[in-house]
Amino acid sequence: DLARTPQNYGRFKTSRGSLLLAHGRDPYFDGWSDTIQLNYGNPELQQAMIGELLRIASQCDGVRCDMAMLVLPEVFERTWGIRSEHFWPKATAAVRKVSPDFVFMAEVYWDLEWTLQQQGFDYCYDKRLYDRLREGHARPVRDHLRAGLDYQSKLARFLENHDEPRAAATFTEEVHRAAAVITYLSPGLRFFHQGQLEGRLKRISPHLVRAPIEPVNDRLRRFYDRLLATLRHEVVRRGEWRQLDCVPAWSGNGSFENFVASEWRGSQGERLLSCINFSSNTGQCFIRFGDDAFRQQKWQLMD
């Protein structure tokens, strides 16, 4: 393996002399040169890493675990040819025994989000929603949001992070606003990245730890102020969410396919409706609420 992929290894000076060590990597790409791979097939290593998590839990409220799925036994064996026992169920249980409210968030891909949720993670990256919003079509977004709430409520929703380009550089301003409403009015953890609310354009490497001065996009800043105010409403914080079906406004009008609609419903009857035309064209639709709450009453819609 060393002769075939020398870029995945490095020689390091240690107290035990010069050692040839493998860089951490996933099965599909070269190793990360700023990392060293640990052998999770070694039970003593797993116990040592649980000890590290316990130490961290005594100092903060939670951790984001980078590429957390690489530790899963089936992924680890596919990458390194080494069998291992499950690590995350033991690790999350050990930490919660001491710090019950400690939060685990996983960076995870390859449709393994549910697997890690079942192994103790409170939240998992929702890269699937992000990718579908970038593609710019409403139907795949709706399909993704049809998943069960036991799964969706444990997803971390985002429009940018340190691995992705800036949202303001990725989307037009109109699409940015629409994607933000879809993302952050969905259930789950709402993840905002430093500089996102100000419309920063330049992606910054976390290794650089500094950034150029950029002007604030006042229009986006005001938009996010309004969005954050909406997210503070009790109906969003403690209510129940559901996706709503959109149907044609009249026969032959296919523009209903471009809409994404949902609502939050509170315990006192309050309702917050979200309806987004996720396209560049004018469209029309009817929304099915699936109950009789609107019949024989007058309602005033407030934007």
Regions found by a protein language model. Name each.
Residues D1-D303:
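Active-site and adjacent substrate-binding regions of carbohydrate-active enzymes
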